[in-house]
Amino acid sequence: RDYYASRGLGDVYKRQVENEQEEAEKLMNELMAYAATFKREKVNAKELIIGMKCGGSDGLSGITANPTVGLFSDMLVSKGGTTILTEVPEMFGAETILMNRCANKELFEKTVHLINDFKEYFIKNGQEIYENPSPGNKDGGITTLEDKSLGCTQKSGSSLVKGVLAYAEPVNTKGLNLLSAPGNDLVAATACAASGAQMVLFTTGRGTPFASPVPTVKIATNSRLAGNKGNWIDFNAGRIVTDDLPLEDAAKELFQLVLDVASGKKVKAEIAGFHDLAIFKQGVTL
């Protein structure tokens, strides 16, 4: 950001040059040359900031993939790292679990506001607060919103909540953070990236090829999905059921995969050249 400001890149968009495209290309080439001087170096795992998201959940989400991510989160936090849990509407019905783990009264009150503000957002726009789970969730075996939310919150593990963030607010506290964003997969994952996540762990039982602006590790809740969509899925948590893989071992494998991706290994979406982003928009679009 400092380099961006020092080179006056914003001037291009203020129309202070005659040919915006030519000037922008010139400055971007300078920026690329500057970026090329960076060299990969070893850093401690405590420098990692990992977003956690689920989508297309099924009956195994709360049994395999989400608990695996939760245990991963605890492992990373114990090493001084940072995780981000978002998709606030998916917390409805299980929010007290997170509230009871807030590190102090201020964070507790922020978490209460986080939940209630999103409910007010639903009401303001005439939407049913509890219009969940989706038809796909029900087909996959989820019965109620509480069922879905209890699965969602498992991604947070058992660590104390150390931060509560507004939408796209940068992370400034290590440990488990809660982030205000909707349940929409791409909007929520993009919000994690905007808040500083270098990677997003995305659990799914129904399957989706989506990917966010940062490496998106897609974790299957069941082995059938992992087998059918091997070009989408990076990690098969379904082995906890089909192969009696201990949860702790699954979390350790996932932790190693995260380290590998942070070290340059490409996830399936990157290999396919697929990524996208979506900004959370409120109000009327004209």
Summary of predicted features, one role per range:
Residues R15-G59, T64-A65:
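Glycine-rich, mobile lid/loop segments that gate access to catalytic sites or pores
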Residues E47, M52, D58-L286:
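Anaerobic metallocofactor- and corrinoid-dependent redox/one-carbon enzyme cores
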Residues D2-Y3, K39-E41, T190:
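Short, flexible, glycine/charge-rich loop motifs used to bind or transfer phosphoryl groups or to couple energy/partner
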Residues D11-Q16, E87:
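A generic structural motif
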Residues D2-Y13:
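Single conserved hydrophobic/aromatic residue that forms the stacking wall/gate
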Residues R1, E18-F38, E169-D185:
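Short N-terminal secondary-structure initiator segments
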